[in-house]
């Protein structure tokens, strides 16, 4: 996937990432997963987004990079969240990867290991060392075009954003592959 792909807005990229591969290389082994659920965070005008109002902190500074970088942060002191930065530099939008489907051989039907944003980062061993990483050309964590992009997409409200303004809570900016058993919530 090239830089241009990630320069689009977060809602566009969130839909386009579905069905594509998130690959983590540990030692010499590749763990291949298929992205099945995402959420878009639209930057300074989205009260559910960490960069709402133009907020820049050490944590949110990753969102101000050019599209194609990672934004990893920790919640509840124990769960890492993996996001893909989108749009132009200083237009802080991102896509949260909520769930993935394991594809690598020997991984089997372990949906309980990857059916949520904290679970997938644990499964793929993604932590803060992967914050602000350029996902284009990286050989430890990267995205790749999927082979089967023929599926229906469900749009729904984002999860756990009750702190946001009602208008943002009601936006249908969560996307997932219909009938995929690895989705965190239906």
From Swiss-Prot:
Documented EC number(s): 3.2.2.-
GO molecular-function term, one example from the UniProt record: DNA binding
Origin: domain of life: Bacteria
Class of enzymatic activity (EC top level): hydrolase
GO biological process terms on file: base-excision repair
Keyword DNA repair: yes
Record key words, sorted: DNA damage, DNA repair, Hydrolase
InterPro entries associated with the record: Formyl_transferase-like_C_sf, MPG, MPG_sf
Gene3D superfamilies in the record: Methylpurine-DNA glycosylase (MPG)
CDD domains reported in the protein's UniProt record: AAG (cd00540)
Pfam families, alphabetized: Pur_DNA_glyco
HAMAP family recorded: 3MGH
Family label: Belongs to the DNA glycosylase MPG family.
Protein's UniProt name: Putative 3-methyladenine DNA glycosylase
